[in-house]
């Protein structure tokens, strides 16, 4: 597994490498998709990190109960080895915020009471 990592600073508006996505503050939440998530800014610790998977990674997939090992999630999603190797993770400290293009971690997902919402969109 490669150890390359990229960082996102506070108030950064877009990311070009390794993936192209936009970051913006919004006032409300529309329907999330695989390519769009809405997160609670107050739960994030900057700089955020974009990295590949590590042994033992786990997250709390949105829409599911409890935590799941990333390896088990990949298996359940029937992802090929190439797909797994090409999947990037958006992390806050060491916690996965988003399996980019797949699923967000419910601990970070914005809800009706969230004050500061950030929309992340894969372009």
What are these regions (language model features)?
Residues 1-123:
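AMP-forming adenylation/ATP pyrophosphatase catalytic core
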């Amino acid at each position: 597994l490669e150890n390359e990592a990229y960082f996102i600073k506070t108030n950064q508006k877009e990311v070009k490498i390794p993936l192209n996505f936009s970051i913006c503050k919004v006032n409300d939440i529309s329907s999330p998709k695989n390519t769009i998530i809405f997160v609670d800014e107050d739960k994030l610790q900057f700089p955020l990190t974009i990295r590949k998977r590590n042994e033992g990674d786990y997250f709390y997939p949105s829409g599911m109960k409890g935590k799941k090992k990333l390896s088990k999630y990949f298996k359940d999603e029937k992802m090929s080895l190439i797909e797994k190797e090409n999947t990037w993770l958006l992390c806050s400290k060491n916690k996965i915020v988003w399996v980019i293009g797949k699923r967000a971690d419910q601990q970070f997902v914005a809800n009706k009471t969230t004050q500061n919402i950030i929309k992340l969109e894969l372009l």
